[in-house]
Amino acid sequence: MVSNGHFASAGDDSFATSYEHGVQVVDEDKEFNRNLSKYLAYENVTPAGFNYHLISVFGSQSTGKSTLLNHLFGTHFSVMAETERRQTTKGIWMSKNKRQEPQRENSLPHVQNPNMADNILVMDVEGTDGRERGEDQDFERKSALFALATSEVLIVNIWEHQVGLYQGANMGLLKTVFEVNLQLFLKDKRSSPRSLLFFVIRDFLGTTPLQNLQNTLMQDLQRIWTSLSKPSGLEDSRIEDYFDFEFAALPHKNFQPDKFVAEVKKLTLRFREGHREPSKHNKTEGGIFLPEYHRRIPADGFAVYAEGIWDQIVNNKDLDLPTQQELLAQFRCDEISREVLVAFDEAIVPFETKQAEAAQSGNPEVLGGLGPAMKNARAKTVKGFETEASRYHKRVYQMKKAELEEKVDTRLKALFAGQLAAAHKSGISQFSDAVTAAVKAGQKKGASYDFADIVSKERKLALETFEKDAKATVVDGTSWSNYTQELALYQKDLEKISAQLRKDEMRRLATRVERWVRSRLGESVGLEFNALGSGRGGSGAPETGDKPSEDTIWDRIWSIFVDTVLDAERRFTERASSFDASLEEVDVGLWRLRRKAWGVLRSKIDEEMMEGNLLLKLRENFEDKFRYDAAGVPRIWRPTDDIEGLYTKARESTLTLIPLLSRFRLRETDTPPQLDRWVGYTPSSATPADEEDLAPIGGVDDDGMSLEEEMTMLSESKRQDLTVRFKKAADGVYVEAKRSAIGGMTQIPVYFYILLLALGWNEIVAVLRNPLYFFMLFLCAVGAFVTYQLNLWGPMIKMAEAASHQALEEGKKRLRDFLEPSEAGPHAARYKNSTEEYEMSNVKAPQRTNSGDDDDEDEGSW
């Protein structure tokens, strides 16, 4: 519904055109218009902050209040027709001063007055003493209380002839105003809210001076104030403590229209900002709008404040302006907080999302540009809140600002912590990777590298990178934006990683040294055991020096072992010094090296003492002593040699090695080396991880084994088995030697060849003299030589044997076929069986005799 000439009434959700001339704030049924904020936005008052002023006009019904406002401020409040006497303004209406506004389309032209204050809002209050409401003064009192709680200036519109009257001069209304003012002040004793009562005397004729009329009105007001029942503590208060008074007179509008317009124009100049001049006894200079009149409600919160005030009034609740101001401040601060947080979310949510996704993926990422974004977002958010909310109740504003900063800082702190965590994790990972890569690069180049220098450089770079990322994320002016603790934790973790990398590098160093020890011991100890298989002197002795004694083999092995480990310890210590390793770490490394070295030696000894290897070395040792003389010359066995004696001596000498090798004992002390002293005690700084890959050592560790058991290389059962097997091998060598001696006796004597040459001389001469025989002999000799050079004698003999065997079988078959039909068949069958039996005995014959003569006899019997 549009009433009062393009005014939006209460409850009317109209279009913007309905607000062209104003809005009904409260209707005649005491309903507040919830669209007041839309009207203020339409009139562009909302962003004005405190730069607005509110005026309310009071007066009896049909006294020309709306007419006065229309002429003063260019408004379009509905006025009463001259031919009628009835209520025109119902409820409370509001319009903005039009005298300073640019002309809108279809609007009446108004005088532009740049001297008036900005954003003057005028409330036209329903007139009093109307017949429509009669004796019902409830709305009158409520509207007065509402106007006094919200307005800076209360214009009292009276006629000149009403001055001196009680009802006609609205003294009853003014008494109500004074009463509600005391009510308001009683709730707000911390301040004295002041208001201006501006009396506009209409139809002024000039007969009675304005000063006299002013005095009359002030006397009446003093009497009313004196008659009021004042609250405790305010009995001696004066009316001037709460109100200022201004007076103006206007000629008759109808009888003196030109003069009326001129005086109205002069009156408009008073509606601008003014101030009190302390040097002139607080005399007001400038306009009537003094700072102390303003209710300090920002324009963007006025609609909510006014609605809250009216709700308290209409429900007959005690009006508590400070409480209402606080409630308004809370409401508006919450609204402003939500508004500024929208822009904050737009700037920060993308970073929060990206950080959360990176954290969920397990790869935290240092977000570029996070620091500036956090700084700008926080500064804009707080600044925007301060700009809009600082005009409200200070305590509420400070509280809400603290709440907003806490919300913002909570999210920014989480981002800050996430950024530092990402920088921490990525920095640790990059540091570890960089050190590892630098070490590998140094290893590939084959040159020595300073591990401590690498760690120091990479740690410095990691700290610089972390501090750079942290400083870039710092938000100045916040208590939580401090990364001292995180930096200390980062440094601590870097030290942990450095120590772990150093420990790993020392493990790798120990592994390399262990391989070197394994190689050296494998070669040196292998040579010592190989020397057991070279028991002969002379040409079989070492190139330099004498052949080492077999009795001192363990002494030599222990000496080699100790020297090798000492050399390895020196290498380890020198290399570890470049790691910046502590003495405790070096001690642990050396202790581990000695234990590992003993394990290497024991493994090598076990390898050499394997049954097959040791049996081979014992046989070689026996053969060197049995088959070679003291000068290292091989023996040619003859029947006259004492083979049994040499065999027994060599065998017994070799058998003495088995008990010697079965236990690791030093010759001087005839006891095992003090392995426990050599290994040393476990360092106090050793950790379980340092011991988990170490094999237990008997006599050193509490594993149940003694040092004697640790130094036992061959058990008793293995010794006995090895002795038996060696004796069998030695017996085989002895039998072979005996055969060799006997074989020398069955050789064809030399004189036989001389006799053969003498008896066959004639045949030899005949062959040499006959060219045909000689040529045939020459061809046979050449063929035999070529066959020998091509190594074909073996295949040819095998082929001849196979061919002869095949021919023999074929002949036997044909003979059987020939004899079977004849009477000689049974005899042939019996002959066949006897032949087969002979063939079997012929096969077994070589196993019964080893002499060549026996073989000749078998062939003769065949």
Swiss-Prot record:
Read off the InterPro entries from this record.
Answer: G_GB1_RHD3_dom (IPR030386), P-loop_NTPase (IPR027417), RHD3/Sey1 (IPR008803), Sey1/RHD3-like_3HB (IPR046758)
Q: Which residues are recorded as binding GTP? A: 59-66
- Name the EC number(s): 3.6.5.-
Q: Quote the cellular component terms of the Gene Ontology held in the record.
A: endoplasmic reticulum membrane
Membrane topology, as annotated, equals: Multi-pass membrane protein
Region annotation (Disordered) ranges? 819-862
Annotated compartments: Endoplasmic reticulum membrane
Provide the GB1/RHD3-type G domain boundaries: 49-306
Q: Where does the record place a coiled coil? A: 481-507
Query: Keywords, A to Z?
Result: Coiled coil, Endoplasmic reticulum, GTP-binding, Hydrolase, Membrane, Nucleotide-binding, Transmembrane, Transmembrane helix
Enumerate the Lumenal topological stretches. Answer: 769-771
The protein's matches in PROSITE patterns, at most eight in alphabetical order, are given as:
G_GB1_RHD3
The residue ranges for the Cytoplasmic side of the membrane come to 1-747, 793-862
The similarity comment for this entry is: Belongs to the TRAFAC class dynamin-like GTPase superfamily. GB1/RHD3 GTPase family. RHD3 subfamily.
> HAMAP family from the entry?
Sey1
Q: Which purpose does this protein serve, as stated in its record?
A: Cooperates with the reticulon proteins and tubule-shaping DP1 family proteins to generate and maintain the structure of the tubular endoplasmic reticulum network. Has GTPase activity, which is required for its function in ER organization.
Protein name according to UniProt = Protein SEY1
The primary gene name is SEY1
